[in-house]
């Protein structure tokens, strides 16, 4: 079984994703990056692009992003759009 982390993707008034994920790929200012379980802690702005979530059950979901911010800490990631 793949290692997971808790991921929340939200925008004002709406949770788009809230659950266990294997990976999330996000568009950052310096290029696309992927967060996985036990990733180093950081905060970074996000740019226009697509977020791709690989859920613990193996499904993949995508979300269009105009801009936002991602925070990773203590095996949790929060993406605010």
Task: Label each PLM-derived region with a short phrase.
Residues 2-81:
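Compact, glycine-rich, soluble single-domain proteins
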């Amino acid at each position: 079984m793949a290692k997971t982390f808790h991921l929340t993707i939200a925008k004002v008034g709406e949770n788009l994703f809230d659950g266990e994920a294997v990976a999330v790929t996000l568009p950052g200012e310096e290029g696309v990056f992927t967060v996985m379980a036990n990733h180093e802690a950081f905060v970074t702005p996000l740019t226009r692009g697509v977020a791709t979530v690989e859920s613990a059950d193996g499904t993949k979901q995508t979300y269009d992003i105009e801009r936002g911010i991602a925070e990773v800490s203590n095996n949790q990631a929060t993406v605010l759009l």
